[in-house]
């Protein structure tokens, strides 16, 4: 495993574990997964050197935090647990109250990384961040982070906090490389981290899906899996397959290895089984030659998906009986 030392948080593994599916039903894992599989995954993750575990108060309406806290057991205070507050009425007193509720569910006295889940379109960070600053001053959290913030808003949050907002968790993968342009350079320059969620684009970068093998379930409504986008992304998937063959890994592992080869970037894929977790963690050992990494970056930049509106139009046309 590879690590980044993050001020206030500690040693952060470059491959972490996203736990949005803990306690949720939309991915079809169910109660057995929550009570047994999730615990086994977390414990195996620790054995493999994973230290970053990401959750949020809204995941399973608090169930994810409870399951994670119980699964970590006595090690819960020794790892980089990251949770998030959804910014409804994000005033200082409310933020402090809800952080304490998350800490109780996680069975922690101190949450290493506490993040604003998304920008509030009405309430500015000058109102939100004083509550985060109080939590820092009181030692209730180790560091403040944000999620789904633009670079400009991240910088505004910095100014409002009066100290570094250490992380920004964003949608980032070879299929969604927007963070490459400005966010990654900023993180490198300012000694911050970018936390990549959906790093495998819901499995698209594993190479399993294509025009002739469309997914069902929640993936079916993801524009990336539309027919036109599956055609457009094929050159990127072929580059992934070529690099994977070159380095002796699987395409999904190469996709993760590309992310964590970038300065200040860590990835938090989910896992539905211990085997999938082990597969993801193995990506930390994949070394990409410079030429291969550059080829992947070029292919990612070249992929231009159709808009969500066009995806919906195409989807309706495909479903019509003529």
Annotated model-derived regions:
Residues 17, 55, 83, 113-116, ...:
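Conserved beta-strand positions
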Residues 23-36, 83-93, 117-122:
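Active-site mouth loops of central-metabolism enzymes
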Residues 7, 69-77, 100-108, 136, ...:
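Acidic (Asp/Glu)-rich catalytic clusters
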Residues 1-79:
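N-terminal binding-site loop/beta-alpha segment at the start of enzyme catalytic domains
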Residues 3, 119-308, 312-322:
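Beta/alpha (TIM)-barrel catalytic core signal, keyed to glycine-rich beta->alpha loops juxtaposed to Asp/Glu
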Residues 103-122:
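Active-site groove signature of glycoside hydrolases
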Residues 9-15, 49-52, 76-79, 108-112, ...:
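Short, well-ordered coil/turn segments that N-cap beta-strands
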Residues 31-45, 91-106, 150-155:
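Short, acidic/polar
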């Amino acid at each position: 495993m590879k690590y980044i030392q993050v001020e206030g948080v500690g040693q952060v593994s470059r491959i972490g574990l996203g736990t949005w599916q803990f306690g949720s039903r939309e991915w079809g894992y169910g109660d057995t997964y929550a009570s047994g599989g999730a615990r086994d995954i977390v414990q195996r993750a620790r054995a493999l050197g994973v230290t970053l575990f990401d959750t949020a108060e809204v995941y399973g309406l608090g169930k994810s935090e409870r399951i994670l806290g119980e699964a970590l057991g006595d090690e819960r205070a020794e790892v980089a647990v990251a949770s998030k507050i959804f910014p409804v009425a994000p005033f200082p007193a409310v933020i402090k109250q809800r952080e304490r509720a998350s800490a109780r569910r996680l069975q922690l006295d101190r949450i290493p990384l506490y993040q604003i889940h998304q920008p509030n379109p009405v309430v500015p960070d000058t109102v939100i961040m004083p509550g985060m600053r109080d939590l820092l001053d009181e030692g209730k959290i180790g560091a403040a982070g944000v999620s789904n913030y633009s670079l400009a808003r991240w910088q505004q949050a910095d100014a409002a906090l009066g100290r570094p907002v250490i992380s920004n968790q964003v949608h980032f993968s070879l299929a969604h490389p927007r963070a490459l342009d400005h966010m990654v350079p900023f993180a490198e320059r300012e000694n911050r981290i970018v936390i990549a969620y959906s790093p495998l684009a819901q499995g698209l970068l594993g190479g399993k899906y294509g025009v002739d093998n469309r997914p069902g379930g929640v993936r079916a409504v993801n524009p990336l899996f539309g027919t036109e986008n599956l055609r457009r992304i094929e050159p990127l998937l072929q580059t992934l397959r070529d690099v994977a063959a070159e380095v002796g890994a699987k395409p999904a592992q190469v996709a993760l290895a590309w992310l964590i080869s970038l300065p200040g970037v860590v990835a938090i894929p989910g896992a539905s089984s211990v085997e999938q977790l082990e597969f993801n963690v193995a990506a930390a050992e994949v070394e990409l030659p410079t030429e291969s990494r550059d080829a992947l970056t070029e292919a990612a930049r070249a992929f231009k998906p159709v808009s969500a509106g066009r995806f919906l139009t195409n989807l309706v046309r495909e479903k019509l009986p003529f």
